[in-house]
């Protein structure tokens, strides 16, 4: 536990007193996710799912964030981050926290989740629990379904240690005896192909109708000797290596897509950053593996169970162990008219996903693709998937002769391969595909449809805080604005011109856009609140984003706090600001909401002396969003929509006392609890009730 931080003046706070380390802050978010696995607010199978989400999150954390810090350390970089820590110090703190977290993860799995699943007749059987009939079935399954695709690799001078794929399941086997060539083989490695299911369900006739499962790792472990005829397997131990998965791409290449394809293949074999082994792995074995992967014991993680929990997934048909089903509602405005275009002409339309349906966005594109009066469709795509309905509708529009322009961000992390496929699908259909601006990721969420009406060209625009991904729109909270506002439409048109053509920075009327005007305008908005507070007027700032790391904005918020501005921050993940510090940030409160849906909306609120400014945006308050990406930040001007966002999207979350976590000045997070007599308030449940 960190000690309390205090000073009599702002200047007395050192750097490490003013800021929280970014890497440690994101690790804290993953810990908040892990805590959902023991939260009785969630049904049992959803708690298990949070356990798996934690595994996936931690995998990416090591692949990207830890790998980056390790590179800095390897290069001898001793420069300190804003919080005052060197790369070496950061790695030490990550290791301490991650080891404790992973131990807790497996303790939750073994002591809470699995026993409770067993009470529901969902069992993950260990080898010693199988009946003779079940053992016979498993042996046959191994012989027919598993062994034919396994490739055991002996380790000797003729067979050096193999290159193993990032995050793949592997076994190291200790052997006695000689092989067919008379060689004395002591060790072998058996990689488990990703094509094999990690969980195998036993037939109902062998389980009395109960759901009994066996791990692939247990099946291989039990029958690994069959892979080495005439030899004896004296030990078999799971292990998994996590590698650096960040892409080092020279963006000055002539063909970005081609260069990306080459980098994607190398991602599978990047530098090792973590080794996971089972708890019973002998010291001489894991030391051998550490040497092969050039890792130290600080990077070794011993686990009490499968080394790849992220793939511990099975389709359990137990509705009572899941969340109640939720069907997103379609706003009434769309039910009163046959055409999306007619609805948008009447008013600005705000969509709040996943409580409201994503279908109107797809319907806008579908109508545009088939309407003979539509001339052009332009859209940005960051994450969508080649088989998504949106991509298929855009391809249909191109085939129907519409001028379709897609700005596809090929460098969206872990979606690069999918986005290359999206580009190919659209190009083959006849769409114009561009990859944005070299050096800047295109992260803005924009659609523009151009339609001929009464001999004039009319534009219809959708702006969003989240990706054009129908599946994510069912589990991520996001806002989308559908509008025909002429100024907003003209601004979107100009940003598309920036992305597809050449020329100077576009001068926009209403939109704020990164990397040009957004950061400076945010500073101006905060300065206005500071001036209002100093003049004795009401001053308040509410920001809801995924992350806050940008130092200038943090310092400006500190300045606002010292001036008396009330600052409320709803930060899902990373927050480098320290709230509640005397004479620095005592007027700043920070909370994080972790629940059924992943909080993804970006909303900025400035009270503006009673004439509130509310913006929705694709941008978090991070350096990369504000300076290295193309982002769109759009104002909400309709009074009814402003009221909706303020009440449902901000105040509702500030009142949450069930899913909220509160950041302390020492960098720790504590669970919000209702005060004595205070009514329980769950923000996401309130919205589910509101939009029934």
Swiss-Prot record:
Residues that coordinate or bind Mg(2+): 383, 413
Keywords in alphabetical order: ATP-binding, Kinase, Magnesium, Metal-binding, Nucleotide-binding, Phosphoprotein, Transferase
Keyword Transferase in annotation: yes
Binding positions for ATP per the UniProt entry: 57, 476, 572, 600
Pfam family, one: PP_kinase_C_1
Family: Belongs to the polyphosphate kinase 1 (PPK1) family.
Matches recorded under HAMAP family: Polyphosphate_kinase (MF_00347)
Protein name: Polyphosphate kinase
Species this chain originates from: Acinetobacter baumannii (strain AYE)
Taxonomic lineage of the native organism: Bacteria, Pseudomonadati, Pseudomonadota, Gammaproteobacteria, Moraxellales
Gene: ppk
């Amino acid at each position: 536990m960190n000690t309390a931080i205090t000073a009599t003046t702002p200047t007395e706070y050192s750097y490490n007193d003013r800021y929280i380390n970014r890497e440690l802050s994101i690790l804290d978010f993953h810990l908040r996710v892990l805590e959902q696995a023991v939260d009785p607010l969630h049904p049992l199978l959803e708690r298990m799912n949070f356990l798996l989400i934690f595994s996936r999150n931690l995998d990416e954390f090591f692949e990207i964030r830890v790998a980056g810090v390790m590179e800095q350390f390897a290069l001898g970089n001793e420069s300190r981050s804003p919080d005052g820590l060197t790369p070496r110090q950061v790695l030490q703190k990550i290791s301490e926290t991650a080891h404790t977290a992973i131990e807790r993860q497996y303790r939750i799995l073994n002591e809470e989740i699995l026993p409770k699943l067993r009470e529901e007749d969902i069992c993950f059987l260990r080898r010693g629990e199988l009946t003779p009939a079940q053992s016979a079935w498993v042996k046959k399954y191994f012989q027919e379904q598993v062994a034919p695709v396994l490739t055991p690799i002996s380790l000797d001078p003729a067979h050096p240690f193999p290159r193993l794929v990032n995050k793949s399941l592997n076994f190291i086997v200790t052997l006695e005896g000689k092989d067919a060539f008379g060689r004395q083989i002591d060790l072998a490695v058996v990689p488990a192909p990703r094509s094999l299911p990690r969980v195998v369900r036993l037939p109902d006739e062998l389980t009395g109708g109960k759901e009994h499962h066996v791990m692939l790792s247990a099946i291989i472990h039990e029958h690994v000797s069959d892979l080495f005829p005439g030899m004896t397997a004296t030990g078999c131990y799971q292990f998994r290596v996590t590698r650096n998965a960040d892409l080092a791409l020279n963006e000055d290449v002539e063909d970005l897509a081609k260069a990306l394809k080459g980098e994607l293949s190398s991602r599978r074999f990047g530098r090792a950053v973590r080794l996971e082994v089972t708890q019973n792995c002998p010291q001489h074995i894991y030391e051998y593996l550490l040497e092969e992967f050039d890792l130290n014991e600080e990077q070794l993680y011993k686990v009490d169970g499968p080394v790849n929990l992220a793939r511990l997934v099975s389709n359990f048909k137990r509705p009572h162990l899941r969340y109640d089903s939720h069907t997103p509602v379609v706003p009434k405005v769309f039910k009163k008219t046959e055409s999306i275009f007619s609805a948008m002409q009447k008013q600005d339309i705000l969509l709040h996903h996943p409580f409201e349906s994503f279908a109107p966005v797809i319907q806008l594109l579908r109508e545009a693709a088939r309407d003979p009066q539509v001339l052009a469709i332009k859209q940005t795509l960051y994450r969508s998937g080649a088989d998504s309905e949106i991509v298929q509708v855009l391809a249909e529009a191109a085939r129907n002769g519409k001028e379709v322009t897609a700005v596809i961000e090929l460098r969206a992390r872990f979606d690069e391969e999918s986005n290359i496929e999206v580009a190919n699908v659209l190009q083959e259909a006849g769409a114009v595909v561009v990859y944005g601006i070299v050096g800047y990721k295109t992260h803005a969420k924009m659609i523009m449809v151009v339609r001929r009406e009464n001999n004039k060209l009319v534009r219809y625009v959708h702006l969003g805080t989240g990706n054009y991904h129908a599946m994510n729109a069912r589990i991520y909270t996001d806002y989308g604005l559908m509008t025909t506002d002429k100024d907003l439409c003209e601004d979107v048109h100009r940003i598309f011109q920036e992305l597809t053509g050449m020329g100077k920075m576009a001068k926009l009327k209403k939109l704020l856009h990164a990397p040009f005007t957004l950061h400076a305008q945010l500073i101006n908005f905060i300065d206005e609140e500071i001036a209002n507070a100093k003049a004795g007027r009401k001053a308040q700032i509410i920001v809801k984003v995924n992350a806050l790391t940008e130092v200038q904005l943090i310092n400006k918020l500190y300045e606002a706090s010292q001036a008396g501005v009330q600052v409320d921050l709803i930060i899902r993940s990373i927050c480098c600001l320290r709230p509640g510090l005397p004479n620095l940030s005592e007027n700043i409160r920070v909370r994080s909401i972790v629940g059924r849906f992943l909080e993804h909306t970006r909303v900025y609120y400035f009270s503006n002396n009673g004439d509130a400014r509310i913006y929705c945006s694709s941008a978090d308050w991070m350096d990369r969003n504000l300076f290295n990406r193309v982002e769109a930040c759009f104002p909400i001007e309709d009074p009814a929509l402003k009221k909706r966002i303020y009440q449902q999207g901000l105040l509702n979350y500030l009142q949450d006392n069930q899913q909220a976590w509160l950041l302390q000045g020492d960098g720790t997070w504590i669970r919000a609890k209702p005060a004595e007599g205070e009514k329980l308030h769950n923000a996401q449940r309130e919205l589910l009730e509101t939009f029934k």
